Regions:
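N-terminal cap/lid segment of alpha/beta-hydrolase-fold proteins
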Residues: 1-27
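Active-site glycine-rich loops that stabilize anionic/oxyanionic intermediates
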Residues: 34, 41-45, 254
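Conserved alpha/beta-hydrolase
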Residues: 54-80
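Alpha/beta-hydrolase active-site loop
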Residues: 86-106
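Alpha/beta-hydrolase-fold enzymes
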Residues: 126-213
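Short beta-strand/loop motif that positions the catalytic acidic residue
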Residues: 250-252
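Post-His helix in hydrolase/transferase enzymes
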Residues: 263-264, 292-305
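Conserved small/polar residues in nucleotide/adenosyl-binding loops
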Residues: 310-312
Length: 312
C-alpha cells in the first residue's frame, strides 16, 4: 500500500511553513526505493493535484515528494499571501525552497537516484534550480514550459514594476492576468470555460474552476518573481552553469499555448541542446497544458517512468 505523508519546513522567507507531501512505495514490495522524484507544481495550483501521477510512480518503487510553493496551497500564513512569493528577490525564492527540500529528502533517502520534475511555472522553477543546484540531480523533467520572446517578458516585468510602484507589491492586477492568460483559449473550438486550455478533461477543468486554491488572482509580487525567473533561465551564462551530463526530458502538448503550440518548446530545447549532452524532446498531439491531467495521462506517466529507468 502506498503511504502518503505530510511534513513541513521553514521557507527561505523565514516566516512561512512550507507544506510538503511525500508518497512512499509499498515496503512489502520494495526493500528500498528505486529513486526519488521531486515535483515542482505550476502557478495557481498545489502539490496534491499530482496525486494520481505520484501514486503511479510510487507503485513502481519511487519515493515522490513535492511542496506547495510560497503563495500556493498550504504554504501561506493567511489567504492574503496567496499569489505572493517573498518581499525581496521573489524570483529566487521558489528554487531555494525546492533545493532545501532536496537536501532534507536526501538525508532521508541517501544514495539513490534523485530526479526533479517541474510543470508550467514549476518548469521555470526547475530550470532555475538546475542553473544553481544541478549537481544535486541525476535527471530533470521539464513539462509544459515555454521560451517567450525576451522583449515580451521584459515588457511584462516593466508593467509589473510600474503597477507595484503605484499600487504596491500585494496588489492583484486583473490587467496583468488578462495579458498573461487572455488569449490561451483562442485555438479551442466550442469553449466552455476560461480555463479550457488546461486540459481536454472537462472534469479536471471544472474541479479547477471550483477551487479556492486554483482561482485566486496572482499578486504583482508573484508576477515579478515569475518574470525574473523566466529572464534568468534564458541567459546563456546561467545555462552554462548547468552540468553538461545532467539528463533532461522536455515534454509538452502540441495544443499548449504556454509553449506556443510547440514553437516555444523547441526554442527552449534549442537553448539547452548545445550544452546538455543528453536531452530528449517529446511533443504530444492534441494535448493541452496539463499533461499529467490529460485524457491520455497514463501514456505520459509511462513515458516519464520508462525514460527515468534508463538513467537509473
Amino acid at each position: 500500500m502506498i503511504k502518503k505523508k505530510s511534513n513541513s519546513f521553514l521557507s527561505c522567507d523565514r516566516k512561512t511553513s512550507v507544506n510538503v507531501v511525500i508518497w512512499c512505495p509499498d515496503e512489502t514490495e520494495y526493500d528500498e526505493p528505486v529513486a526519488v522524484l521531486q515535483i515542482c507544481h505550476g502557478m495557481i495550483e498545489y502539490i496534491d493535484r499530482y496525486d494520481g501521477f505520484a501514486r503511479y510512480m510510487a507503485e513502481r518503487g519511487f519515493v515522490v515528494v513535492g511542496n506547495d510553493h510560497l503563495g500556493h496551497g498550504k504554504s501561506v500564513c493567511t489567504d492574503d499571501d496567496l499569489g505572493f512569493f517573498k518581499d525581496k528577490n521573489p524570483g529566487e525564492a521558489l528554487a531555494k525552497d525546492a533545493h532545501h527540500l532536496t537536501v532534507l529528502i536526501k538525508k532521508m533517502y541517501p544514495g539513490i537516484p534523485y530526479y526533479l520534475a517541474g510543470h508550467s511555472m514549476g518548469s521555470f522553477v526547475t530550470r532555475r534550480y538546475i542553473c544553481d543546484y544541478g549537481y544535486e540531480l541525476d535527471g530533470v523533467i521539464v513539462m509544459g514550459t515555454g521560451h517567450q520572446p525576451a522583449p515580451m517578458v521584459f515588457a511584462g516585468k516593466v508593467l509589473a514594476d510600474v503597477v507595484r510602484l503605484i499600487k504596491g507589491d500585494r496588489y492583484r492586477s486583473r490587467l496583468i492576468s488578462k495579458i498573461m492568460f487572455g488569449a490561451y483559449n483562442k485555438r479551442i473550438k466550442n469553449v466552455r470555460t476560461v480555463n479550457d486550455w488546461l486540459t481536454r478533461d472537462e472534469a479536471v477543468v471544472d474541479e479547477y474552476n471550483a477551487g479556492k486554491l486554483t482561482t485566486f488572482l496572482f499578486t504583482v509580487n508573484g508576477y515579478r518573481g515569475l518574470m525574473n525567473m523566466i529572464l534568468y533561465v534564458r541567459k546563456p551564462r546561467n545555462i552554462e552553469r548547468i552540468p553538461k551530463n545532467l539528463p533532461m526530458l522536455m515534454i509538452s502538448g502540441l495544443d499548449d499555448p504556454v509553449g506556443e503550440y510547440g514553437k516555444g518548446v523547441y526554442r527552449a530545447y534549442n537553448s539547452y541542446h548545445g550544452h546538455i549532452d543528453d536531452i530528449d524532446l517529446r511533443l504530444y498531439e492534441d494535448c493541452r497544458h496539463e499533461l499529467c491531467n490529460e485524457l491520455n495521462k497514463e501514456e505520459i506517466y509511462e513515458e516519464i517512468y520508462g525514460l527515468s529507468l534508463i538513467h537509473i
